[in-house]
């Protein structure tokens, strides 16, 4: 999985691991572990079940059925009961307990307005709760205070100085034990409803197999595409990058670069 970006430059850590053999803990059974053919067939069955599960999620229609604290208490403006998820906005975000404690993503929020920063970080934490992602509490980062001294004007008042003070606030949220597809959905939802004036840094942890380098070398120009977080985005830079990735010029130079690197690797 390539590095994914959310608003700003992003780094992606990768933990390489092998798939262990499924050992049988029972000492009475003569078969101590799975054979290679059995293990391969088991993996195929798991992949088929995973694809069927994803297809079921895409095809099934979920009916919106909000829960209410009380159906008798009505909102004086809308004349309707207040949904539970709207009532929870008055309280701090609810967290799901981590199951394994494997960190999959971290989002940092930085901005000059403290209220916008709290709103953005709590929005990410609430979205993680409704997506079933175990998430940490919203944590504060170190506040940065900077003082800038500049001249008032380059001519008549060149010797007069003027001071400007800028305070940068920060928050961060950790996500645990979620699949890459759910993390992509979470980040795309946050990117879609991003608040202006808040800087989002997403650090994503992914796990790849030992043959990841071979798969990376086998990529072609047709496999290069924008992350799912930019689908439906109005960002002109993202739209221009997507246009360049689909252009024939990019495919031409990408194939030429792969051909130029192949003789060096053979040596």
From Swiss-Prot:
Q: Where in the cell is it found?
A: Mitochondrion
- As listed in the record, the transit peptide stretches over 1-10
Q: Which key words tag this protein in UniProt?
A: Mitochondrion, Ribonucleoprotein, Ribosomal protein, Transit peptide
The residues the entry assigns to the signal sequence are none
Please give an example of a GO cellular component term from this record. ribonucleoprotein complex
**Gene Ontology annotations of biological process type:** translation
Q: Which GO terms describe its molecular function?
A: structural constituent of ribosome
- Keyword check for Ribonucleoprotein, yes or no: yes
The keyword Ubl conjugation is assigned to this record = no
Which SUPFAM superfamilies does the UniProt entry name for this protein? Ribosomal protein S10
Xref: SMART domains: Ribosomal_S10
Its quaternary organisation is:
Part of the mitochondrial small ribosomal subunit.
Query: What task does this protein carry out?
Result: Involved in mitochondrial genome encoded proteins translation. Involved in the binding of tRNA to the ribosomes.
User: Which family is annotated?
Assistant: Belongs to the universal ribosomal protein uS10 family.
PANTHER family the record matches = 30S RIBOSOMAL PROTEIN S10 FAMILY MEMBER
What name is this protein filed under?
Answer: Small ribosomal subunit protein uS10m
Source organism of the structure: Debaryomyces hansenii (strain ATCC 36239 / CBS 767 / BCRC 21394 / JCM 1990 / NBRC 0083 / IGC 2968)
